[in-house]
């Protein structure tokens, strides 16, 4: 049972994702989306506008691609770098496929950034959860002391949260878009890290 725990949890998340999709299609998640938007935008000003634009940049294509190139070029362990970039690539493909299948339009609210693709699931959130999530995985597996591992992981874990909230605040996504994105990326990460752990010794020793 323990051996397949990640697969079981990933399967549960897929079921939850399907439920979210059904609720969206049936229009039964409107209240959740509206309440979340009202909470996030209960206080708006120029400072917050700019702050959330910075947060959203941390999940943007430009930043994520730049980070992946940096990792590939400067990370000594090329297999580990390849795994990180590969995880992001898988997430990107999954996001685009789901967007094309689901075809949800963007929210009609005060929008501070312009987006032209479909809304569900949030690409910024999926990319952020995947990149920072896989980095957390490797940090926790590293030889750093426990305090350093936890501190770095907590800081990295804040980034996808900030990205997700920023997408709602900026009017780019419904709350259910970022929720679906987080669920999808987490399910993918669970499956990916299962296989990474099986071959971790080979990956960790590779240069």
Regions found by a protein language model. Name each.
Residues 24-26, 75-76, 102-103, 170-171, ...:
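Short helix-capping/hinge motifs at transmembrane helix termini and TM-loop junctions
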Residues 45-50, 94-105, 163-169, 191-196:
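Juxtamembrane membrane-interface segments at transmembrane alpha-helix termini
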Residues 111-207:
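Membrane-embedded catalytic cores of phosphoryl/pyrophosphoryl-handling enzymes
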Residues 30-31, 73-145:
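Membrane-interface loops
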Residues 11-15, 65, 84, 88-92, ...:
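Alpha-helical transmembrane spans of integral membrane proteins, capturing the lipid-embedded, hydrophobic core
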Residues 16-20, 90-97, 158-167:
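Aromatic-anchored segments of alpha-helical transmembrane domains
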